[in-house]
């Protein structure tokens, strides 16, 4: 859906008439030309600076392999940005717009009640065939309900550069290939409804991801983590 230069007053209409219906019907959607060239360039330049100054580190695997870095499974380099850091004004503006879109979706997201989100994960696939194998963002109820990815790749040609995000919507007879083109914003459900992969990239590929949390599921996940931590500490003390 091409949007040109978004005005804040348009966000509620976009959320209610496009994002909500698409999420319920197919599980994902994307908006093109989200920020416009000028602001999008500001975000891109800041991300490039983070990359060039060595701020990015190898992405880690979650689940049973939590904390493990295996480059053949996940080849990106990442850092986390809150938006209040010096020089991150454009990123902060981007995050505020995404926040407003999700806020306007509100109760129409079904069972979810969104109160918070993660920091922004800035990611770079450095080329050389790096990608991310098929996975689910939230397979075990950690609270994440919506994944939002903003792409930053100018003149991207998927036939030459690869790097497609391929989504395998649960229960659907199709797959969805999303090219990571500059100024594109993607939304999809974070749970098992949307297994996905990043296909091998043969050029530097930048993206920024935020996850929105369902309040109840997130609280329960934190409670389970605290209980597990206490049990582990107790077992270590007994030993």
Curated annotation (Swiss-Prot):
Enzyme class: oxidoreductase
A GO biological-process term: regulation of neuron apoptotic process
Organism lineage: Eukaryota, Metazoa, Chordata, Craniata, Vertebrata
Protein name per the record: Prolyl hydroxylase EGLN3
Activity regulation description: Activated in cardiovascular cells and Hela cells following exposure to hypoxia. Inhibited by polynitrogen compounds probably by chelation to Fe(2+) ions.
Protein task: Prolyl hydroxylase that mediates hydroxylation of proline residues in target proteins, such as PKM, TELO2, ATF4 and HIF1A. Target proteins are preferentially recognized via a LXXLAP motif. Cellular oxygen sensor that catalyzes, under normoxic conditions, the post-translational formation of 4-hydroxyproline in hypoxia-inducible factor (HIF) alpha proteins. Hydroxylates a specific proline found in each of the oxygen-dependent degradation (ODD) domains (N-terminal, NODD, and C-terminal, CODD) of HIF1A. Also hydroxylates HIF2A. Has a preference for the CODD site for both HIF1A and HIF2A.
Binding residues annotated for Fe cation, in chain numbering: 135, 137, 196
Cofactor binding notes: Binds 1 Fe(2+) ion per subunit.
Domain writeup: The Beta(2)beta(3) 'finger-like' loop domain is important for substrate (HIFs' CODD/NODD) selectivity.
């Amino acid at each position: 859906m091409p949007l040109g230069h978004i005005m804040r007053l348009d966000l509620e209409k976009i959320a209610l008439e496009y994002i909500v219906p698409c999420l319920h019907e197919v599980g994902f959607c994307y908006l093109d030309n989200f920020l416009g060239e000028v602001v999008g360039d500001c975000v891109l330049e800041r991300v490039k600076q983070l990359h060039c100054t060595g701020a990015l580190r190898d992405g880690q695997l979650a689940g049973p392999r939590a904390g493990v870095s295996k480059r053949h499974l996940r080849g990106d380099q990442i850092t986390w940005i809150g938006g209040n850091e010096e020089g991150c004004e454009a990123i902060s503006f981007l995050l505020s717009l995404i926040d407003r879109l999700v806020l306007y979706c509100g109760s129409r997201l079904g069972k979810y009640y969104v109160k918070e989100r993660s920091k922004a994960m800035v990611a770079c696939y450095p080329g050389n065939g790096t990608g991310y194998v098929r996975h689910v963002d939230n397979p075990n109820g950690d609270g994440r309900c919506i994944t939002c990815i903003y792409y930053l790749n100018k003149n991207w040609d998927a036939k030459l550069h690869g790097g497609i995000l391929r989504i395998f919507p649960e229960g659907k007879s199709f797959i969805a290939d999303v090219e990571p083109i500059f100024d594109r914003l993607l939304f999809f459900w974070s749970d098992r409804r949307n297994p996905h992969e990043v296909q091998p990239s043969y050029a530097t590929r930048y993206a920024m991801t935020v996850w929105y949390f369902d309040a109840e599921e997130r609280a329960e996940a934190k409670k389970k983590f605290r209980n597990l931590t206490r049990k582990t500490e107790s077992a270590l003390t007994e030993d």
